[in-house]
Amino acid sequence: LLLKAKTDGRWHTQEHLEKNVYKEYGSILAASKGLTVSDNGNESVPMDMSGHKYSGTTAMMLNIASHNQGYEVPVFLNLATMNANGIRVNENAVAIPVITKNGVENVYNIDQTDYPMKHPQEYSNMKLNQVLESRLSSENKDAIESLVNNNRFTTKTSFDSSVGSASYSAIDNTIHVAPVGEYDKKDGFLQDLSEGLVMRTRKSEPVSSRFENILKEGLIVHLGSGLVGQKYGYDVGETAGSKFWKERLKNDPNYTKAVIKAAERSSDKIIDYVDKLQKGQSQSSNLDMRSTTPIDIDVDGNGIVESDENLAPDKKQGADEEKDNNQEESHHQHRHFHR
């Protein structure tokens, strides 16, 4: 099938197109067994036909989709590329909508097209290149761990927890993880550590004991850890709470968008923090979210849009702020999520 892009009509407004993207992202996440999954330690970031690599959430979603569908080569083509090169999509193939700098576009994996049949040698070379190309160097993979071991983070790390039970204590500004020797793989330790760092960025969020809010916060931590893992080349697997939020992800694109945007803010802050530390630039201890601009969606159904929730701690000024914060922190000393 030779496809043509349709760009007019009520179902092709930017808002509607983006809603479809997050609906698809929710379905991809709900079907996943992990956020970053590599084969024998080697994995290439999804890319387009010209070799340009996707990044961030888009790369994560295409990576998960490749594993969910069993695609052998993580190369994705948009309609313009396929039409320009006379590539036809297979019958019944379903596109994945993604958000790019040019807006929303539909992409197909190269395995969904006639390219492998028309150009077997070129396709074989693509597969070989994917096997040979390690997604990230081991030096990059060890970036976060080396900074912790050398006490370069302003946030303290205490190795007194159990595997899969990372937590963050706001009272003493400490991330708690298990000793690295207790993990079967180093990736598990790095996942716990990055989850603790994401919790650290979320410390100024209002604490709520509502079950749905706790699950949402756990999902944000999980996705944020996945984005950090994608950057530094370690696997992030499933979480124990996934069965509770998978149905919500499949059916509520606003919820999916809210948690993804929150995870992006946290992971971007951590990656920027690590990058500057690696370059020897001094960093403050303010690894939190107060300077970010969240989206205006009430995903919890509590009558408060997300931006008001995120900024709520900043609305208390003067002497009452310290009192309120101390009461909050004494009641919720740890943000603690289990896998």
Where are these regions (language model features)?
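Non-Sec secretion/translocation targeting segments of pathogen effectors
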Residues: 1-4, 8, 289-293, 297-302, ...
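N-terminal accessory/interface modules of nucleic-acid-binding and processing proteins
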Residues: 1-294
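Generic structural signal for well-ordered beta-strand positions
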Residues: 304-306
